[in-house]
Amino acid sequence: MSAPKVTPMVRQYLSIKAEHPDSILFFRMGDFYEMFFEDAEKASKALDITLTSRNKNDPDPVPMCGVPHHSANGYVARLVEQGFKVAICDQVQDPSEAKGLVERKVVQVVTPGMQLDGRYLDASQNNFVCAAVTGRGGVGLAFLDISTGAFLVTQVTTPESAFQEILRMGPKELVLPEKFEENARAAAAMRMADQLPTSRLEGKDFENARTRDRLLEHFKTRSLEGFGIQDLPLAVRAAGALLHYVQQAQRQEITHVTKIQAYFQDQFLWIDDNSARNLELLKNIRNGTRQGALISVLDKTVTAMGARLMSYLLRYPLIDPQVINLRLDAVEQAKDLARVRDEVREALKEVHDLERLRSRTALGHANGRDLAAMGESLKQLPRLWALLKENFESPLLCGEATDDGLTDVADLIDRSIREDAPPGVRDGGMIKPGFNEELDEVAALATDVKGLIAGLEAQEKERTGISTLKVRYNKVFGYYIEISKNQTKSIPPHYVRKQTLVNAERYITDELKEFETKVLGAEERRVALEYNIFTQIVDRINGENDRLEKASHLIAWVDVLAALGHVADHNGYCRPVVDMGQTLDLQESRHPVVEKMLPGQRFVPNNIAMNNLDQQILMITGPNMAGKSTVLRQAALCVIMAQMGSFVPAEKAVVGVVDKIFTRVGALDNLSQGESTFMVEMQETANILNNVSHRSLVILDEIGRGTSTFDGLSIAWAVAEYLHDYKDHGVKTMFATHYHELTDLTKTHPRVKNFNIAVNEWNDEIIFLHSLVEGGTNKSYGIQVARLAGIPASVIRRSKQVLQTIEDSEEARVAYSAKASGKSGKKDVQVQMSLFPTPGELAAQALERMDINVMTPLEAMNVLSELQQRVKRPEKAPADVTAETEDQE
């Protein structure tokens, strides 16, 4: 575009756009936000709105599109959801006061991690943005949720651990240094950057001194020691950079972020992303929703704050029995006091999302409806606090926050804010009558102009005695008094003639001019005055930010603990004994999700007992559909529930604290990375073997399925041995398998115990009993299961024939292998698998390759005799029969 064609407005737009090249610029023009050039083309396509142009007759028109300012939030949310950043550029000057171009500037940058509008956020999940930085000693991570004020930091030793931590926390956006990928290992581990919207900051924004000073300035402190992060330099660097990023996006200080909390991975039960997915903690594998996941059973919270805390507790179970039992004490009280618990939950139902309301208020994004919701929530506190203090003893249920009912804040909102306040803060209609005398007067002028004019007219008629006197208005003279000419002799001396007409005279008075000043612009003054009063109320509320934060925190905990008590009561859960022992003993345990998905049916409970003395590895065999996977998962879920502080679905439960849970359940191809099902399976298994400890719980559901039978069996056998012998202590493991040969491990490994899922056979049918019983089984019932699945009868019949042939052949193979191998050492597999074909297999191969059409009868008889002799003498090393027969051919 040539310079002469650039208008001042376009020049202003281009200047602001140059500062935000990676964002779609919402440029405020009157009642619309306009977008131009490439932004308009992108936004029109993403939002499905009309793309038009500015200066259509120009040979090079400017593409443009726009959205109404009052509905802009919805359009912004849609763009952000599609991965765009949006820079909101507002008019920061009253157009009536502008002597030229209205001043504009970007007031907010909205990104996936910077959303504040609760309508476009998942109420049950935090909306974190994460910053990561590498350095000597590992990786520093910081997570900040601008919508709640939560600010968490940690430091880990490896990029792989950082990657897993990011997956577990689930941020919506990443912030990385520009040269982050120069660390090749970090770049590989942090491939999350390819899956999440990622912003880059200059390296200097992550520097030690700069980030530390930024945190000290924000928290108004001289040291970071009080936050416990002074010895975490990488975490400090990540936190300082993230704070800078958020402040830049919001264009202001984020005063509602009042603390920063350090945490460490070894404080919590480690559940990697693969295990969390396999166990379906937060979403099911089928379609990624909550239905059918553990969270759907446990999350009976009634507030958004409680739902977010429940999700966090499920992702971060504890490993400290003392803290776990403190939670269990509170849940037990909530379970036992059902009537009080229900009253508490009823009160909580009236509480809105105080955390996000507090944040919106602090950042200047709250409207009248937000304050009304906050006031309605705070009204519940006196009743709620009284119920807690009078009935519960747990400090988690009646903390010090119960001494503060925030009645002063609730009263302020109740007196000032209308319940039916409009969504806009500059439209008026927010403040209740009677709260401000000046506003009441201005509002009266704005809403009752006709009545005031009639009153003034009646007053002047009475004062002058002129019955034809009228008070009128036009745009030229404003308000005036009109008197017919035949009565002008009676006008008072303070009337000033303004205009002479044929039949009347028009006058003004000082009182009328004062009235005009009040009435004209009364609506504008009312709206402006309301906004000023509203901001004063907001400032007073923001002054109580710490009190609101404490109340929100306690409400979330009360909601979670009451919900867990409710679930335990209604589902028949028991309180687990959680200690530092090495025992896992679940009596009559059930799968918490599956039992809820069997309406009208009884879930078959099972006893699961493990320890480090004589029953550490449970080798579980049995047919498909019998329930092996269910038993495995329910054990892991019971441990997770116990260590998060929940009761568990069992008659009795003893849980020696577990530090890590690993699962290897099923596998999917990772074709985009060139990885097969078997490779994925082996990677998951390698992760387990390289990271277990003697306090871990390992769940293995079929190892070695993605390769040949003998390879798979060999790997499964070796994995089981490794876990049994791990550092002389072993690892508690539940190992489901169809390799019945693995049951022989009990002969050489004392802490391996065989179990199977019982079935009954009747008339060639199988009945699944779903009971875990001691002992192994050598039957898989695969053909029966195939028949249940609807495989055609002809295929079933043929399957039985093939199975019989294979079983007969296998019996011969086992007999030969046992005879050939002799006695084996303690660590040897009891049935050795030959690496070479047996003589019988070689004979079969030779027969298959022979061409009898070119052989004489005598040659055929000689070859047949030779093959027969070799099969009869298996103890002799197999010769290359194939080569010999080829020579004879």
Swiss-Prot record:
GO MF annotations, alphabetized: ATP binding; ATP-dependent DNA damage sensor activity; damaged DNA binding; mismatched DNA binding
Region feature (Disordered): 869-889
Keyword RNA-binding in record: no
A cellular component term, taken from the record's GO annotations: cytosol
SMART domains: MUTSac, MUTSd
GO biological process: mismatch repair
Sequence similarity: Belongs to the DNA mismatch repair MutS family.
Job of this protein: This protein is involved in the repair of mismatches in DNA. It is possible that it carries out the mismatch recognition step. This protein has a weak ATPase activity.
Protein's recorded name: DNA mismatch repair protein MutS
Species this chain originates from: Desulfatibacillum aliphaticivorans
This protein's encoding gene: mutS
